[in-house]
Amino acid sequence: LGKAPFMPDEYFGREFNPLDIGLENCQTMIIFPAVSGFVGGDITAGMMETVNCNELTLYLDIGTNGEMALGKGDRYVCCATAAGPAFEGAQIELGMPASKGAVDKVWLEGRRIKYLVIGNDRPVGLCGSGLIDALAVLLKAGIIDENGTILSGQELPILFRSYVFEVEAEETAQSTESSLAVHIAPGVYITQEDIRKLQLAKGAIAAGIEVLFKEYGCMPCNIYVLTFAGGFGNYIDKASAAAIGLFPQELLDKAKEVGIAAGNGAVSAALSKEAWERA
């Protein structure tokens, strides 16, 4: 995977002997066909289960490798983007998985930033959905500008000045970011460096979508439905994602969650020969 272009030895899409991997109580094992080295069989399975072949569909599976596909009928284009782990809470100062104590929802209510915590417990950090919400809220409140820079002093709306504070800057020669941070919940904050990492992840996904539009020769207005697959895609607030530029704003009304589409596709193929042949 470290060389470009990475060409896998096999694209699968066939039946295997379960005994080869030590599965003794299984009659047949099938592995969905991969599209390329970075677009695997999970995308094939998910699209088979959710994509309407007659309508132009944009399929997103957001994760460390943001895999996506666009098309209809017998023509699809796909790509994978190096979004990195920021949306999963990794490499964020107070980032964490979506578990007990994670702030998973953030919104603006009047002059206050409000939040929800998984398990209704003491807030410990921010998971992916909370991070996306937080960025959208900071932008809406005028706490960050359109470039993602945390504002200070007279630049800040007076109602939100108490949310911004200074943290100890890391003593690294490479760090050029300010030492400002923003309170989200008691003991939980987001730093300028965190925002930059989230911008990189967001930019990778947005760039992938733009490339698909260019390759397919279409525009956002041509899309019939935007589907979000996978666990993370089910939980992010689509309005917040559109507000920070993860996908075009005009697709917001066309966005929907399709659950664990790859798992559902695998079940369909296991139970139906017709579904497996279609994959």
Where are these regions (language model features)?
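Phosphate/pyrophosphate-binding loops at sites that engage ATP/ADP/AMP, CoA/4′-phosphopantetheine
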Residues: I209-Y224
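Glycine-rich phosphate-binding loops at beta-strand->alpha-helix junctions
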Residues: P220-S240
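Glycine-rich phosphate-binding/hydrolytic loop that grips phosphoryl groups
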Residues: G41-E49, K202-G203, A255-A279
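Acidic-enriched catalytic cores of C-N bond-cleaving enzymes acting on peptides and small amides
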Residues: C78-I190
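Short, well-ordered loop/turn and helix-capping segments at boundaries between secondary-structure elements
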Residues: G71-D74, A82, E109, V137-D145, ...
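ATP-dependent carbohydrate kinase catalytic cores
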Residues: G2-T81, G110, S152-G208
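Glycine-rich phosphate-binding loop of actin/hexokinase-like ATP-binding domains
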Residues: L1-E15, I30, A45-G130, D237-G259
